C-alpha cells in the first residue's frame, strides 16, 4: 500500500530547496540598485578595453560536438558508482550497465554518421 505520509520529509526538502533560490533571486532583484549606463552595457574582457564585437556567431558544429561531449561525460558519472561496487552487485547489474553502454554506443555511431563529430 502506498503511504503518502512516509514522503513528508521528501516533500518538505523539495519545497524548501525550491523556495530558497526563488527567494534569493527575488530579494536580490528588489534590493539591487538599478544603474543603467554605457559601462553597464559594455562587454568585460579582464579589465582591458574590449577588442571587436562581443556578439559572435558560433558554428553549429561546435554546439553539436559539445552536446555529444556532455552526453558522454554524464555517462561517465553514471558508470563510476557501478564500477566501484561491481563486486558487490553481481552479474545482473553488469548486464544492465552493458545495455546502457551499448545504447550510448549506438547514439555515438548515429552522431558520427550524421556528421556531428566532423570539424570541416
Swiss-Prot record:
Single GO BP term: photosynthesis, light reaction
Transmembrane intervals: 9-29, 64-84, 88-108
Topological type in the membrane: Multi-pass membrane protein
One GO CC term on file: chloroplast thylakoid membrane
Pfam families, alphabetized: Oxidored_q4 (PF00507)
Enzyme class: translocase
Keywords linked to the UniProt accession: Chloroplast, Membrane, NAD, NADP, Plastid, Plastoquinone, Quinone, Thylakoid, Translocase, Transmembrane, Transmembrane helix, Transport
Catalytic activity: a plastoquinone + NADH + (n+1) H(+)(in) = a plastoquinol + NAD(+) + n H(+)(out); a plastoquinone + NADPH + (n+1) H(+)(in) = a plastoquinol + NADP(+) + n H(+)(out)
Domain of life the protein comes from: Eukaryota
E.C. number: 7.1.1.-
Compartments reported by the entry: Plastid, Chloroplast thylakoid membrane
Family: Belongs to the complex I subunit 3 family.
Role of this protein: NDH shuttles electrons from NAD(P)H:plastoquinone, via FMN and iron-sulfur (Fe-S) centers, to quinones in the photosynthetic chain and possibly in a chloroplast respiratory chain. The immediate electron acceptor for the enzyme in this species is believed to be plastoquinone. Couples the redox reaction to proton translocation, and thus conserves the redox energy in a proton gradient.
Complex and partners: NDH is composed of at least 16 different subunits, 5 of which are encoded in the nucleus.
Protein name, per record: NAD(P)H-quinone oxidoreductase subunit 3, chloroplastic
Source organism: Daucus carota
Amino acid at each position: 500500500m502506498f503511504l503518502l505520509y512516509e514522503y513528508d520529509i521528501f516533500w518538505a526538502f523539495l519545497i524548501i530547496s525550491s523556495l530558497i533560490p526563488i527567494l534569493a533571486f527575488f530579494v536580490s532583484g528588489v534590493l539591487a540598485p538599478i544603474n543603467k549606463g554605457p559601462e553597464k552595457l559594455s562587454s568585460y574582457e579582464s579589465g582591458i578595453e574590449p577588442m571587436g564585437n562581443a556578439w559572435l556567431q558560433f558554428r553549429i558544429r561546435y554546439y553539436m560536438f559539445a552536446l555529444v561531449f556532455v552526453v558522454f561525460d554524464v555517462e561517465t558519472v553514471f558508470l563510476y558508482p557501478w564500477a566501484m561496487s561491481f563486486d558487490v552487485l553481481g552479474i545482473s547489474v553488469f548486464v544492465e550497465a552493458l545495455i546502457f553502454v551499448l545504447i550510448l554506443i549506438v547514439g555515438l555511431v548515429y552522431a558520427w554518421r550524421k556528421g556531428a563529430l566532423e570539424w570541416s
